[in-house]
Amino acid sequence: GRRPCCNECGICDRSLDPMCICEDLVPQCHEGCQACEKVDTGTPMYQCRSFEYYHCGPICY
């Protein structure tokens, strides 16, 4: 399937096709996120805390 976009990838593993933790705060976690955490910033936002495959980069739509 299509990989979810991540503007700011944090820690990534060192494999050839790296899995990363996405630092983005989003209105809802992408389908397939295994560890979705609610982050309260005044409005409820979510962050996926599991290592997943992403398209990383600042211009990702």
Swiss-Prot record:
The record marks R14, S15 as: Reactive bond for trypsin. Expressed in bulb (at protein level). One of its GO terms (cellular component) is extracellular region. Gene3D superfamilies: Cysteine Protease (Bromelain) Inhibitor, subunit H. GO terms for biological process: negative regulation of endopeptidase activity. Disulfide bonds join C5-C60, C6-C22, C9-C56, C12-C20, C29-C36, C33-C48. Signal peptide: none annotated. Keywords: Disulfide bond, Protease inhibitor, Serine protease inhibitor. Transmembrane segments: none annotated. Belongs to the Bowman-Birk serine protease inhibitor family. Serine protease inhibitor. Inhibits trypsin (Ki = 30 nM) and weakly inhibits chymotrypsin (Ki = 550 nM). Does not inhibit bacterial subtilisin. This is Bowman-Birk type proteinase inhibitor B6. It comes from Hyacinthus orientalis.
